[in-house]
């Protein structure tokens, strides 16, 4: 029997809170939960007691790592809040949550404004066309400047940022804001932010309020022709008309309303929740989700409605200490019911829905069904991993796959005791299920277990979780860079594998052309006249692909090449798949050694923010790390230096920067591209590798 939907779809808001690390995102989310009545005591990130940050490592570091999806109710609306991490090592979590939310609130700090990670997250939100609004937090701290932040948003994010509030006071005198839409002042009387007075705009602010209100109305009427005409004819635009036009503009990604507050001091949070309801989209406001039919490959559309066939995306897998594997899902269409069977078309397997839960930040509510627009978690799935679709067996669809970046850093890891080996292997496999940018494999030559990830912090957190959650004590090696190899010119080469000594022989023979090529490995079969029988062709392809795991320079994976198989020969009796696989790998090795092979290294995009007086010193240091300065700009009393630096030169940089700037500099980096390693350094790397 179907449970009736409690709230209509148009009352749903699935939103993410995005920000730079330390912008106060978790505190802001906490306050939303507090005011919507889900939390009785406010959790402070400073005490490590925040409700959203439920993993121990997050509570220690005061940063958010796991995006938890939380449901709360505000003024008859259902708000599902997806908490996204702001640290660049966890960009994949941000991408993943952006994929399943409909709108977002970007939290900026009144002092730092648009910081490096804000830009990264903003670009990701642009990619997924997520409508968003901005909230300038920490208005109470030294150096808070709301108007500078709005200008930074326009310059650095190219956003049409339009304040719909302006602050009254700043730093320790911050006490409220002017609501530009309603043209009134709101003053906070207490520290819990629950007592507010609506007053007339203070005398000394009337001029600036009028100026900003005029600019806001102009920006809003530009989005609506009828209002534009009315405005040009000098008529008054009502509050309702402004709200409606602003909502339309936000949904079309044409305008970003900006608000202000201090979440820590409980000021400005409720108006922000009101704005989420007023201006951000419901699932009905966004285009229907598109996917492909697993058999025909045709495009399929699913509208947000309970009457459509069920389609759901698993956007996060988490291991819960009490109930095992949890799959966080977003239901796009139809109804997912407890105890039923569904299809995972990506894996081609049926899955049984064990239990359905709606998550509050750290407690869960069991439900019978999840409806279109809902976010929740499923217990009991066996084969489903992040990015998989779950759908109605009779109406299969694969919702678009999410693409995840390649890992750039690796470390060797070993258990402290022999007995821990198997347990470590199983635990690492579980962690890899949760996080597609984390990989684990065994190095065939040394027998070591290697883990790969997006940065030092990423791998630190993984090792930490191994020890805490899975109780595996382990030792880790020094971080290693994920070098790659490639070729610079096209060549032809032969691979011939012949064995004729007693018993059945082996015979495989092929000619290939290997060419540099940006992108994934491609294999083209250009054999004519049956020089090699069809059934042996895939074996050659496999042989080449396997051989490319270890290049000829220093045994690193080979990328950016394609292969054309154009000739060869076979033996009626002695040829086999195995022989052709070996011939393929021999041809690959021969071709690569003649094709000007080079070593590639990951180059990071680095942003360093330092006080003016340390700039020369820090830039000199970047140059000494083979860095290439890409530009700089002055921000409040500091310089923002942008540069490209090889990852191998960035290990331990945090400590160096701290000592060079007496703890006042900070930096962030993300992977940008692969680049050829200079010859002299290539020799060093090969020497190290051969030790």
Curated annotation (Swiss-Prot):
GO terms for biological process: ribosome disassembly. One of its GO terms (cellular component) is cytoplasm. Transmembrane segments: none annotated. GO terms for molecular function: GTP binding; GTPase activity; translation elongation factor activity. It is found in: Cytoplasm. Residues 10-284 form the tr-type G domain. PROSITE patterns: G_TR_1, G_TR_2. The keyword Protein biosynthesis applies. Keywords: Cytoplasm, Elongation factor, GTP-binding, Nucleotide-binding, Protein biosynthesis. The keyword DNA-binding does not apply. InterPro entries: EFG_II, EFG_III, EFG_III/V, EFG_IV, EFG_V, EFG_V-like, EFTu-like_2, G_TR_CS. NCBIfam families: EF-G, PRK12740.1-5, small_GTP. Catalyzes the GTP-dependent ribosomal translocation step during translation elongation. During this step, the ribosome changes from the pre-translocational (PRE) to the post-translocational (POST) state as the newly formed A-site-bound peptidyl-tRNA and P-site-bound deacylated tRNA move to the P and E sites, respectively. Catalyzes the coordinated movement of the two tRNA molecules, the mRNA and conformational changes in the ribosome. This is Elongation factor G. It comes from Clostridium tetani (strain Massachusetts / E88). The lineage of its organism: Bacteria, Bacillati, Bacillota, Clostridia, Eubacteriales. The gene is fusA.
